[in-house]
Amino acid sequence: MGDTKVETISRLAQWRIENFGPCSFKKSDPFKVGIWNWHLSIERNRYLSVRLFPELSRVSKEQPPVAKFVLRVSNVGPNRRFYISPVYEKLLRTTDDCVWHVDSSFHGRFTIDVEFLDLKICPVNGGEASPVWPTDATMQSISTQTTLKCLSRMLEESILTDVIIHTADGTLSAHKAILSASSTVFKSMFHHDLMEKESSTIHIDDMSRESCMALLSYLYGNITQEEFWKHRLALLGAANKYDITDLKAACEESLMEDINSSNVLERLQEAWLYQLEKLKKGCLMYLFDFGKIYDVREEISSFFRQADRELMLEMFQEVLSVWKPV
């Protein structure tokens, strides 16, 4: 029948019924809102009963909808009347989950609207329902991604750069505003009467061009995991030198992930140099609690010749605490 079709636009679905006539039940064709196909149905007994329910499918079974919506029934004609339901918020699975009884009888042509105010997916195994439509968090994520793409282009294409960085083996272009926002040290360079402010140049002679590019990629938000992993020791030094605390913390976490016998002494030295307490404890635990000190017997003499005396004292105290007789 022609009057079983439901028209949709955005979050509104409208079912125009040309003639309900003497029949006591009518069901609409499926219509899609969100990720589900829906049906409306009407039935006349003592009341006009309007039902909203999802089409039985794998999607509605595995990802049942939690819908917040309003129903409205109106007749067509000069004496138009509107009947508006309460705002429902329900988990909808079957035809009986939402039944709205309208205390009026409609004859001839009338319209049923359903306006979805919100739609969420209810986890079958419990937990918090997840929204189908964009939320503030979603829009924030989209905005962040767009901003990062713009920053990436600014760096890669040298768009309106205003500072030159001289590294050990080449030069790079950057933006004073980005550097200043990321580092109090860079900010001080450009806000006081220092050489960097006058010449619009920065000398970072203790970093290669490749490592410095990794630093800029981090500050501009487009560094890759591979790039970070490759240059993390150089990045750690730069983070400490230029007071980039979040980068310093990220480097420490990364260096904690792959401590082994071939790098533990080097990591311990880095931890002491840059005051990385978590990394230092991790290295000492690896050496003494787990007994890996025996695996570095050949390297330990050279390490002790170069190590800071306070670090050596701390290592000795760690030995005493681990091997303390019961």
From Swiss-Prot:
How this chain assembles, per its entry, is:
Homodimer. Interacts with CUL3A and CUL3B.
Q: Name one GO biological process term.
A: protein ubiquitination
- Tell me the superkingdom of the source: Eukaryota
Record domain BTB: where: 161-228
**PROSITE patterns, alphabetically?**
BTB
Q: What is this protein called?
A: BTB/POZ domain-containing protein At1g21780
Q: What is known of its domains?
A: The BTB/POZ domain mediates the interaction with some component of ubiquitin ligase complexes.
Gene3D superfamilies tied to this protein: Potassium Channel Kv1.1, Chain A (3.30.710.10)
Its keywords, alphabetically, are: Ubl conjugation pathway
